[in-house]
Each structure stands twice: as C-alpha cells, then as structure tokens.
Amino acid sequence: MAQKKASLACTECGSRNYSIGVSSTPKPTRLEVNKFCKYCKKYTIHKETR
C-alpha cells in the first residue's frame, strides 16, 4: 500500500510548515509533534492535517 501525504499545521498561526507520509489506514487520533514554526519563530505543537 502506498502512503498518503499529510501536512503538519502550526496550532498557533495555522500555517502548514511540514509534510509527512502517513499510512492509508484510518487512525482514531491525529499526530501531534513539537516542531519549529518559521512564522512564529518558536517551537509549537504541529497537528496532522489531510
């Protein structure tokens, strides 16, 4: 099975800064990662969007 692309969006400003490959099987929760946002200029939580 091929992976689908998903974006990681900043929870503070909403910009989609990162893209990741996720499996196509549905999951009950979405991925949350602490990453650097170049627009906020700080580390924030980024949530998976589709």
UniProtKB/Swiss-Prot annotation:
GO terms for cellular component: cytoplasm; ribonucleoprotein complex; ribosome. It comes from the Bacteria. Keywords: Ribonucleoprotein, Ribosomal protein. Disulfide bonds: none annotated. The keyword Membrane does not apply. One of its GO terms (biological process) is translation. One of its GO terms (molecular function) is structural constituent of ribosome. InterPro entries: Ribosomal_bL33, Ribosomal_bL33_sf, Ribosomal_zn-bd. SUPFAM superfamilies: Zn-binding ribosomal proteins. Transmembrane segments: none annotated. NCBIfam families: PRK00504.1 (NF001764), rpmG_bact (TIGR01023). Belongs to the bacterial ribosomal protein bL33 family. This is Large ribosomal subunit protein bL33B. It comes from Streptococcus agalactiae serotype V (strain ATCC BAA-611 / 2603 V/R).
